[in-house]
Amino acid sequence: MFKAFGIVNSSERNIHVEGLQDYRAIGAFSFLGRYRVIDFPISNMTNSGIEYIQVYVKNKPRSLVEHLGTGRHYNINSKSGNLQLLFSEHSGVNDIYNTDIDNYYSNLECIEAVHYPYVVIAPNYMIYTTDYSKLIDAHIESGADVTMLYHSVDNAKENYLNCHILNLNRQKGVLSIEHNHGNAKNRNIFMDTYVMSKELFISLIHKAKEISSLYTLADVINAGCRDGELDVRGVSHRGYFASITDFKSYHDANMDLINIKTAQTLFD
């Protein structure tokens, strides 16, 4: 039996792809003419042996629900696995309160009911391939509380401006998580991908709700890094990586992969 279940989270509040996101979730965007963006995180999970996956849907769910169906096209075994779509209860007061923590808290019973000891959390708006089974093994071997995946770039001044960055020490320990403000070109872009125990994940959800209704999972982990309460490690990703955070990044990612050599870094 595999050690972990998967969570595919919806896009953050500050991300908006003009002209497209008003009609469908980013995960439902067409990509390269034959995929949807959400195919990448789900395929990463199923190809890594993760068969129990929760997909969090924030808004405009119809096209996403139609595409995902029962998950059979991802080779999810319906007897041993499940592709579960979960919806959040939106705050009608202000969208600023509709955080990932709020989504998880609204569906806490579904998380608690899962019998796997570890969880892999990935976003629905980033394009990359990786083997999560190796990431989980590295996490367990390190003894860290949380493992975070990052990609080192040299163009952070102009790109990835809606992403987080990781500040690391020499041992790849995470010192802090910050927004990329475009003030340096070399940055470690956080890929919004976490590995941790289910028990710790649930405790972080409760802690974030106690601290602030505005807190995200990244916020509560960042607080733990700064206070020394959490041992958080970074793992570097190799290969193609794109973050779909606006129309330009969506267009550029599609254009990048026309080049066969670039495409090989994603699909090989």
Language-model region placement:
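Left-handed beta-helix
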Residues: 1-10, 18-20, 199, 208-268
